[in-house]
């Protein structure tokens, strides 16, 4: 199952019907009553109770993405792919929906792959970060284990040494290791890298820095 950056909802359908479409496809033998009860569970889970009959045009970007997440998790997938799901959402809403994503993952324990250009988002949400070389022939350069304990508080992470170490490591990769050319092995990080990383606002989005890598 995939959650896209551009929401990809059926514009003529309500919130409830967009989610129900996925549930019925996943469970064609279910009675309508069971389907509706299951759909309502996921509507409530993403905080859209009361908005069930609204169509996508009447929703904010954050609400639309909540519908997309609810639709994806309602199929109870073993593997879920998130393609920059928070890229079009403002920073405050992004944090709220990220927390909802973690809660849904905690309940389902599905395997989730998320594509992101935000270094902090990757560290806060994931158990492992896959660092890729630059395109057009991008390859896996390194797997970074994120062993920060859960649940993770953004406020607490700001002063967490392991969080700062991970953030610095990934940023240095973007500077030193991501630009391996075609036919070259990923260079990785120089052990004697001397550049320092500005950590004044460790939770700031880093989309520009990552997308240039």
Give residue spans per PLM region.
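A short, proline-enriched helix->beta-strand linker immediately N-terminal to the Walker B motif
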Residues: 74-78
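Hydrophobic anchor residue at the start of the ABC signature
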Residues: 69
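Conserved ABC ATPase "signature" region
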Residues: 27, 32-51, 103
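Short helical segment in ABC ATPase nucleotide-binding domains corresponding to the A-loop/adjacent helical element
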Residues: 16-24, 36
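Catalytic Walker B motif of ABC-type/P-loop ATPase nucleotide-binding domains
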Residues: 80-83
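ABC nucleotide-binding domain signature
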Residues: 1-7, 111-113
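Conserved ABC ATPase signature
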Residues: 55-59, 63
């Amino acid at each position: 199952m995939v959650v896209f950056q551009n929401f990809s909802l059926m514009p003529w359908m309500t919130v409830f019907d967009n989610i129900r479409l996925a549930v019925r496809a996943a469970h064609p033998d279910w009675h309508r009553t069971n389907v509706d009860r299951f759909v309502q569970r996921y509507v409530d889970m993403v905080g859209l109770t009361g908005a069930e009959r609204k169509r996508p045009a009447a929703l904010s970007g954050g609400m639309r993405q909540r519908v997309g997440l609810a639709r994806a998790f309602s199929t109870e997938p073993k593997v879920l792919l998130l393609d920059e799901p928070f890229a079009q959402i403002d920073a405050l809403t992004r944090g709220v929906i990220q927390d909802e994503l973690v809660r849904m993952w905690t309940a389902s324990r599905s395997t989730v792959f998320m594509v992101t250009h935000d270094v902090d988002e990757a560290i806060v949400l994931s158990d492992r970060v896959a660092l890729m070389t630059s395109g057009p022939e991008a390859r896996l350069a390194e797997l970074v284990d994120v062993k920060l304990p859960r649940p993770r508080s953004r406020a607490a992470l700001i002063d967490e040494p392991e969080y700062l170490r991970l953030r610095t490591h990934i940023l240095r990769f973007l500077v030193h290791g991501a630009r391996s050319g075609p036919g070259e092995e990923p260079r990785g990080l120089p052990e004697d890298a001397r550049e320092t990383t500005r950590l004044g606002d460790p939770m700031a989005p880093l989309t520009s820095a990552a997308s240039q890598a």
